[in-house]
């Protein structure tokens, strides 16, 4: 398939086109709960069908451009029940098809990585929305809550400060343009006119296998259990020639 699109305005319990790993689930109110206050550990939710990331069969060599948008809420528990600041965050990711949660990837590893090394065997591109930056536990993080672009490592290649708002709905748009190898992330809150934006150069074909899974992952520790809720999710991808000159000629 050269194109794939799906759209979830809301979710339903036992949704058959979402794969749940860990204890991720859908609430009776139609919210995809990647984590919730009563749980610790790692939770992931992936779209059930694989995505065609690139194709070498054509003369030009095709690589997928994609766009995704989703809304989510990160909400902290009452202060009297917390032992620390927010731990740890939420990530949108692309990984090998049928990817499983790696061992040793809890808490600040977001259920994606086993270490902070740039290991090409990971084959992961992720966008993290990180609410925790304690240097004692996450020495790779900047000294602020942030949005980061991760390539084969939890140590982001690009970050931008995230003005996180407890319990508010955040709207995210992520686009990837294959001809320019440009990944752009924008996060905004409906009540605000400003956006948090980060752009990074990412060679999708060099990082990912031909077929990938897309989804969300979150890790929480024992110190502070935050809710990470996905309210809606849209995704579309399209294979196109991996050559700007070819695209301009079409």
Swiss-Prot record:
Domain of life of the organism encoding this protein: Eukaryota
Ligand binding (Ca(2+)): 130, 132, 138, 141
Classification via CDD domains: lectin_legume_LecRK_Arcelin_ConA (cd06899)
A Pfam cross-reference name: Lectin_legB
Molecular function, one GO term: carbohydrate binding
Database matches in Gene3D superfamilies: 2.60.120.200
Keywords for the protein's UniProt record, in alphabetical order: Calcium, Glycoprotein, Lectin, Manganese, Metal-binding
Cited InterPro entries: ConA-like_dom_sf, L-lectin, Lectin_LegA_CS, Lectin_legB_Mn/Ca_BS, Legume_lectin_dom, Leguminous_Lectin
Matching PROSITE patterns: LECTIN_LEGUME_ALPHA, LECTIN_LEGUME_BETA
Function: Di-N-acetylchitobiose specific lectin.
Name of the protein in its database record: Lectin 1
């Amino acid at each position: 398939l050269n194109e794939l699109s799906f759209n979830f305005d809301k979710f339903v319990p036992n949704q058959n086109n979402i794969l749940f790993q860990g204890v991720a689930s859908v609430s009776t109110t139609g919210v995809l709960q990647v984590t919730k206050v009563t749980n610790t550990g790692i939770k992931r939710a992936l779209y059930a069908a694989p995505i065609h990331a690139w194709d070498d069969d054509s003369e030009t060599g095709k690589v997928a451009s994609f766009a995704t948008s989703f809304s989510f809420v990160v909400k902290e528990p009452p202060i009297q029940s917390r032992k620390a600041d927010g731990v740890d965050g939420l990530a949108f990711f692309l990984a090998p098809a049928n990817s499983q949660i790696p061992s040793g990837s809890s808490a600040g590893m977001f259920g994606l990585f086993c270490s902070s090394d740039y290991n090409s065997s990971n084959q992961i591109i992720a966008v993290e929305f990180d609410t925790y930056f304690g240097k004692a536990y996450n020495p790779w993080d900047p000294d602020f809550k942030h949005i980061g672009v991760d390539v084969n490592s939890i140590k982001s290649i690009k970050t931008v400060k995230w003005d996180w708002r407890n319990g508010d709905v955040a709207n995210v748009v992520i686009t990837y343009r294959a001809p320019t190898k440009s990944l752009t992330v924008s996060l905004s809150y409906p009540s605000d006119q400003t956006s948090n934006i980060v752009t990074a150069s990412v060679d999708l074909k060099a990082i990912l296998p031909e077929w990938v899974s897309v989804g969300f992952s979150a890790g929480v520790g024992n110190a502070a259990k935050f809710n990470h809720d996905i309210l809606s999710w849209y995704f579309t991808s399209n294979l196109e020639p991996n050559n700007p000159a070819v695209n301009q000629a079409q």
